[in-house]
Each structure stands twice: as structure tokens, then as C-alpha cells.
Regions:
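A short SAM/SAH-binding and catalytic strip from SAM-dependent methyltransferases
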Residues: 149-153, 160-180
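Class I SAM-dependent methyltransferase Rossmann-like catalytic core
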Residues: 21-76
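S-adenosyl-L-methionine
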Residues: 122-155
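Conserved beta-strand signature within the Rossmann-like core of class I S-adenosyl-L-methionine
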Residues: 211-217
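Mobile active-site "lid"/loop adjacent to the S-adenosyl-L-methionine
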Residues: 170-198
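Conserved SAM-binding loop of SAM-dependent methyltransferases across substrates and taxa
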Residues: 89-101
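Conserved class I S-adenosyl-L-methionine
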Residues: 79-90
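Charged, low-complexity C-terminal accessory regions
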Residues: 217-274
Length: 274
């Protein structure tokens, strides 16, 4: 086989390998049936695949996130338990450092990919908790968009730090796609639900008596091949974040990830003490 034939077959083979890997991950990742039906496992597998394709582009964002979380942890006077919302993938969570600073680490999410499950098997101080942080997915799955205000862990005195790890802008993504497809929810209704979910999570974080660290996408920025911004869209359905914190950019979709002519950057805001 000459070099040109091998080059010509390489990309299809790589594509097929990725498809097989995603399919295997989907089939072997534990996920409660209601969340699987809504599309959460599919979304999580997709994010994991995008991370593998864009590991270098994501590196600075992940490091910024970890640094902020550790700064928040370092300011805690109590060192019992750290509760992390959105820990199913672990890419942005400085798990080893948190274990060195706290007695226990609770990783809370709807489902957990292999690295999180492996870490919990190896370290008994890690607890995986399957948690609907919105407290509303059961009703949303039935088409009822009246939200329930979450209260999980608010009365737990052992919680020394809460971290909300890049989930604020994601809370509405799967529910809205599901409701639009299953119940023909309108665009305006999706926007209203998105705003309600964002506000509910911010209120939930504000109800904790312990320190809270927040990392959240604030805006989606679309750029053309020259790097010029062509559009900027709120990632939080126009719900404003409080003043303060720090800001950085996440090169989530470099050129070629979506198409050859556009890239997508997320503007991220982080709060050491939300």
C-alpha cells in the first residue's frame, strides 16, 4: 500500500474509531433511565469527545478553573467536606488537591464518566452522589415547567465549601431540547425556562451558609476565520451575574470543530467567594 492510499483512508478510519468509542462509552456508562431518555448521557458523551479533540485548546480554561477552585478552598476556615456540583467529567476539578485539603469530597452530578468512577473506587473519601441540582427534572420530563427550588445539603453542617463547576449555562440545554422535541415547546418558552433555571441555581448557591465558588460561562462569542467577532450571545439567557469576579476566555470550539469558517469562544466568569 503506498503512502497516498494510506493517507486517503486514515481520516475515515479515525472517524469510525471515534464513533465506535462514543458508542462504547454510551453503552457502558451508568445513567438513570429518565436522564438517559432526556438526552443527558448523549450530551455528556459528546462533551467528553469534544474534550479529547480539543484538549490543548481547553487547557488554559481548565487551569484557570482549577486555580480559582483551589483559591476558594485555601480561604476556607473549616476543612470538613467540599461539595462539587457538575463533577461528572472531572476535567476542571483539582481532585487530588481538594483531597489534600478536606476530609471528604462529594462529587455531585446526574452521571459520572469513567475517571470519576475510578477515582471513587480508589479513594474512600470521595463520594459520588447522583443529584439533580435543579430538583425539577422529574416534572420537566413530564412537560411541567414549574420549577422546584433545590434544597439538597443546605442543612448539612459538614459542608465547608460548595463549588459550582461550569454548569450554570448547561442547566437548560438538555431540558429545552427535550421539551422542544417532545412537547413542542416554543422558543420564547425555552428562553423563559432557561432564565428560571439560571436564577434558581444562583439562589440555591446563595442559600448556603458556607463559602461558595462559582465558575460559569457568561457569553458565547462566534468568530470568523480572521478572528473577528461576528456574534455574541448570552450563555445565561440574559440573566446577569453579580459584579466582580474574574473573567477569561475558553476556546471551546476552535476552527474546524463546528465548520471551517467559524470558531466559538466562551467568556467565563469565576467567583472565589460568590
Amino acid at each position: 500500500m503506498d503512502g497516498r492510499v494510506a493517507l486517503g483512508t486514515g481520516l475515515p478510519c479515525l472517524y469510525h474509531y471515534r464513533m465506535i468509542r462514543e458508542c462504547f462509552t454510551y453503552l457502558t456508562t451508568p445513567c438513570p433511565a429518565p436522564y438517559r431518555r432526556m438526552g443527558y448521557l448523549r450530551e455528556c458523551v459528546g462533551i467528553e469527545s469534544r474534550y479529547r479533540r480539543n484538549r490543548k485548546a481547553w487547557a488554559s480554561h481548565l487551569e484557570e478553573s482549577r486555580t480559582l477552585m483551589l483559591e476558594a478552598a485555601g480561604q476556607c476556615t473549616a476543612r470538613d467536606t467540599v461539595l462539587v456540583f457538575g463533577a461528572g467529567l472531572l476535567h476542571d476539578i483539582p481532585l487530588a488537591d481538594l483531597l489534600g485539603m478536606f476530609r471528604r469530597v462529594i462529587l455531585a452530578d446526574l452521571l459520572f464518566m469513567t475517571p470519576a468512577r475510578r477515582a471513587a473506587r480508589r479513594e474512600e473519601r470521595i463520594e459520588l452522589v447522583t443529584l439533580d441540582v435543579t430538583a425539577s427534572l422529574t416534572s420537566l420530563a413530564e412537560g411541567n415547567t414549574t420549577l422546584t427550588q433545590p434544597t439538597a445539603y443546605l442543612d448539612d453542617p459538614s459542608i465547608s465549601l460548595v463549588i459550582s463547576a461550569s454548569i450554570l449555562s448547561q442547566l437548560s440545554v438538555v431540558p429545552n431540547l427535550y421539551l422542544e422535541k417532545r412537547f413542542r415547546q416554543s422558543e420564547a418558552e425555552s428562553e423563559q425556562l432557561g432564565q428560571a433555571l439560571v436564577r434558581a441555581h444562583l439562589n440555591y448557591l446563595g442559600a448556603f451558609e458556607c463559602p461558595v465558588a462559582l465558575v460559569a460561562d457568561e457569553a458565547h462569542i462566534i468568530r470568523d476565520r480572521s478572528g473577528a467577532e461576528t456574534a455574541t450571545v448570552s450563555a445565561l439567557h440574559d440573566v446577569p451575574l453579580p459584579a466582580g469576579g474574574r473573567s477569561w476566555d475558553w476556546d471551546i470550539c476552535p476552527l474546524g470543530e463546528i465548520d471551517r469558517d467559524h470558531s466559538v469562544m466562551h467568556r467565563v466568569r469565576g467567583f472565589v467567594g460568590f
